C-alpha cells in the first residue's frame, strides 16, 4: 500500500512540474493581394490608425486530466476498501447530472500529507452530499403541488351565492376534515348546478374551472329573442301616434258619430234605388196621375142642342 501511494505521489509531482507551453496562434493574417502591383504594404488596416498589431492566443493545459487519472488509478489497490469505494462511485455517479464539456467529474487535490485512504474517504463522501440534495429537492416539489390543490378547487365552490361552505380548506400538512351530515348534499348540489351552468366547449375557453352564473330571467330573455328576430320590422313612430289619438275621448266620439251617419246615408241611398227600379217595371217614371191614351183627339160633346130653321 505504501509503495502504491509513493508511486502516485511521484507521478502527481512529475505532472505538476512540467512546464506549460503556450501555443501561439497567429490571427492577423492578411489576404493575398492578386489585383495590386505588390508595391503597397499589407500591414495597414485601412482605417488610418496604422499597422495592425499581432494578436496572439495562448492555450494552457487543463489540470483535470491528472485528477481523473488519479481517480481511475485509486481502485487498483489490493485492499477491499478500494473496491467499496469503486462500487460507491459507480452507483452514485449515474444518478447525478451529466457534466458539461471541459468540466471535471470529481476534483481531488493531491498534497504530500494525504494518503490513499484519505483520498478514498473524500471520494466516497462527496457523492453522498449530491444524493441528499436530490432528496430535499423532491420533497420541496411535493409540498408545492399539495399547496396548489385547494387553490384549483376553489372556483367550483363559488357557483351559487346562496350556498355556504361548510368546511374550510385544509393545510398541506393537516389531514382532511370530514364534512358534517349535510355536507355531502351541498357538494352534490353545487356540482350539478356547476355542470348545468358551464358554457359549451365551442364557446368557452375549454377549461372547466371557470363557470358563469345564469338566472331564470336571462334564459327567458334568450328564448324570446329568436322569436322577435323572425318578426318583420314595425314602425314604432306610427303605432305610437295611432295609440295616442285613440286614447282621447273627443277623437273616439267623432269616429263613432261619423260611422253612424255614413251607415244612415247608405241605407237611404239603397232605398231610393229600389224605389226607382219598381217604377221602371210599371213603365212610368213620373209621380203624377197617368194621362189618357188618345192624347189630344177631338171628343164629341155629350150634350146635344137642337136648332130650328
From Swiss-Prot:
Low complexity bias (residue ranges): 173-183
Top-level division of the source organism's lineage: Eukaryota
SMART domains found in the cross-reference section: 4.1m
Family matches, as Pfam families: Syndecan
Signal peptide per UniProt: 1-22
Residue numbers on the Cytoplasmic membrane side: 275-309
Location of Phosphoserine modifications: 284
Localisation: Membrane; Secreted; Secreted, Extracellular exosome
Keyword presence, Signal: yes
Extracellular side: 23-253
A GO cellular component annotation in the UniProt record: external side of plasma membrane
Annotated glycosylation sites: 37, 43, 45, 47, 205, 215
Membrane-protein topology: Single-pass type I membrane protein
Annotated stretches, region: Disordered: 28-57, 145-185, 283-309
Residue stretches spanning the membrane: 254-274
Site (Cleavage): 241-242
Record's comment on post-translational modification: Shedding is enhanced by a number of factors such as heparanase, thrombin or EGF. Also by stress and wound healing. PMA-mediated shedding is inhibited by TIMP3.
One function term, GO molecular function aspect: cargo receptor activity
GO terms for biological process, alphabetical: canonical Wnt signaling pathway; cell migration; myoblast development; positive regulation of exosomal secretion; positive regulation of extracellular exosome assembly; receptor-mediated endocytosis; striated muscle cell development
Family that this chain belongs to: Belongs to the syndecan proteoglycan family.
Job of this protein: Cell surface proteoglycan that contains both heparan sulfate and chondroitin sulfate and that links the cytoskeleton to the interstitial matrix. Regulates exosome biogenesis in concert with SDCBP and PDCD6IP. Able to induce its own expression in dental mesenchymal cells and also in the neighboring dental epithelial cells via an MSX1-mediated pathway.
PANTHER family the UniProt entry points to: SYNDECAN, SYNDECAN-1
Protein's UniProt name: Syndecan-1
Amino acid at each position: 500500500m505504501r509503495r502504491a501511494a509513493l508511486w502516485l505521489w511521484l507521478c502527481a509531482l512529475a505532472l505538476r512540474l512540467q512546464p506549460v507551453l503556450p501555443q501561439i496562434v497567429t490571427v492577423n493574417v492578411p489576404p493575398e493581394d492578386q489585383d495590386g502591383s505588390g508595391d503597397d504594404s499589407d500591414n495597414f488596416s485601412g482605417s488610418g490608425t496604422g499597422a495592425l498589431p499581432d494578436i496572439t492566443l495562448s492555450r494552457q493545459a487543463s489540470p483535470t486530466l491528472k485528477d481523473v487519472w488519479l481517480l481511475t488509478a485509486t481502485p487498483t489497490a489490493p485492499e477491499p476498501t478500494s473496491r467499496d469505494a469503486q462500487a460507491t462511485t459507480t452507483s452514485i455517479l449515474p444518478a447525478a447530472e451529466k457534466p458539461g464539456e471541459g468540466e471535471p467529474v470529481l476534483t481531488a487535490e493531491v498534497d504530500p500529507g494525504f494518503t490513499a485512504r484519505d483520498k478514498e474517504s473524500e471520494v466516497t463522501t462527496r457523492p453522498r452530499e449530491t444524493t441528499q440534495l436530490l432528496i430535499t429537492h423532491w420533497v420541496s416539489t411535493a409540498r408545492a403541488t399539495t399547496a396548489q390543490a385547494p387553490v384549483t378547487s376553489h372556483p367550483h365552490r363559488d357557483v351559487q351565492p346562496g350556498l355556504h361552505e361548510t368546511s374550510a380548506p385544509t393545510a398541506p400538512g393537516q389531514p382532511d376534515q370530514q364534512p358534517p351530515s349535510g355536507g355531502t348534499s351541498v357538494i352534490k348540489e353545487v356540482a350539478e348546478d356547476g355542470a348545468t351552468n358551464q358554457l359549451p366547449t365551442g364557446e368557452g375557453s375549454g377549461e372547466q374551472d371557470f363557470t358563469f352564473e345564469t338566472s331564470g330571467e336571462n334564459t327567458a330573455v334568450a328564448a324570446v329573442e329568436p322569436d322577435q328576430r323572425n318578426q318583420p320590422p314595425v314602425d314604432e313612430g306610427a303605432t305610437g301616434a295611432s295609440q295616442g289619438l285613440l286614447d282621447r275621448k273627443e277623437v273616439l266620439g267623432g269616429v263613432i258619430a261619423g260611422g253612424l251617419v255614413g251607415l244612415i246615408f247608405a241605407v237611404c241611398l239603397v232605398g231610393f234605388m229600389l224605389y226607382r227600379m219598381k217604377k221602371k217595371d210599371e213603365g212610368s217614371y213620373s209621380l203624377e196621375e197617368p194621362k189618357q191614351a188618345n192624347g189630344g183627339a177631338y171628343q164629341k160633346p155629350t150634350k146635344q142642342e137642337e136648332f130650328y130653321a
